[in-house]
C-alpha cells in the first residue's frame, strides 16, 4: 500500500513545477498581484510591500526577494514573518477573504480548487492507495467535500486528515468526507504525558470519551515526523517506555494504528541533521539517512543480522503487538469496557500509573493491563 503526503495549505515561496506539461499553469502564474485577495488568485498578497525576513543575515548575503510579499503559510498576513512563522511557505487561496471577515467565495469554483483537484486526480490515477492531508483544517471543509467526492467517485483512495482542533473532528468526517483523522491532541498527547509522568493514567479514559461515536475513525500513533521520538532524550529516553502506550492504542479500539519508520527499532532521533539540529525528531527539513534503518535494510537483505540485540528485542515486541492487533477477533471487532473508569475508587488499583480495559468477541475475552 502506498500513502503519500498531500500539502494543500501552502507551498514553498519559490514553488514552481520542473516537470509539468506545457499546457499546465503553475500555481500563481496568472494571479493579479495588485489585489490582496481575489477568488481567481492562487495566493494572497500584500500589495506595495516587500518581503522582509533576514533574521540577522547581512543584506548582501540574502539574495531572495519577493514583491509584492505573499502571505505566509500559517496565516501570517505580514510582510515581516518571524522566525517561528512558516516563513519558507506561502498560503494558498481557496476563496476565503481572511482580511474581510473570512467571507467565502465558493461560487463559481475558485481556481485553486480546480488546480488542487488536478493534483489529487493525477496521483490517484497513478494507483496510490491513500493521501495523508497536511494541516487539513487550514483548508475550507467545503473544498474537501467537493474534492474528495470527485476523487472517490473515480478511485478507491483513503483520505487521512491532520486536524488538531477537536471541535472540527465531526464536520471533517461528515461534511469533509475524510476516512480518518489524526488522534494527536487527544490520545497521543495524553499517552506522552503519562509516559513522562506528567499526568495520570486515568486521563486515557477522557480520550475515548471525547471521540465516542467515531473512535474507529481516529488514527492512533506514538511517533510521526513532526513529533519527538519515544527513545529521544526529549521524550522518554528509551524505546521500552513506549511499549505500554503502544499496547493501549493498538488494543483499545478498532481504529487504525500507525508506526513511524524506525520506531520498531527504538530509533532515538538524536542525530544532528543540519538545519534541524538535535531535536529528538528525524529529518523534518533535511535529507538524512538513519543508521538503525540502514542496518535493517542491510544492502537490500531487509533482515535483522545488522541490528543490535536491543533493536531486535524492540522489533520483536512490536511484531507481537501488531500481530495481536490484526488477528485477535476481540481486538479487531470486539466490544470495549474501560476498567480504569470502573475502578476510580478502588484502593487496590493505582489509577495514576495503571490503565486497564476488557475486549470481548463472542466467548473470547481479553484483559489488557
Residue ranges and their predicted role:
Residues 153-234, 238-240, 247, 251-254, ...:
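Glycan-recognition surfaces
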Residues 1-122, 170:
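Substrate-binding/active-site clefts of carbohydrate-active enzymes
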Residues 1, 13, 88-112, 128-138, ...:
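The substrate-binding groove and active-site-proximal loops of carbohydrate-active enzymes
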Residues 224, 229-369:
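Loop/helix patches that line or flank the sugar-binding groove of alpha-linked glycan CAZymes
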Residues 8-11, 116-139, 220, 224:
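Active-site groove signature of glycoside hydrolases
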Residues 1-3, 126-131, 155-157, 216-217, ...:
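Loop/turn elements at helix/coil->beta-strand transitions in domains of secreted/extracellular proteins
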Residues 10-18, 139-142, 167-171, 228-231, ...:
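Short catalytic/ligand-binding loop motif for oxyanion handling, primarily in non-cytosolic enzymes
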Residues 3, 11, 137-140, 144, ...:
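Aromatic-lined carbohydrate-recognition surfaces of secreted/lumenal glycan-active proteins
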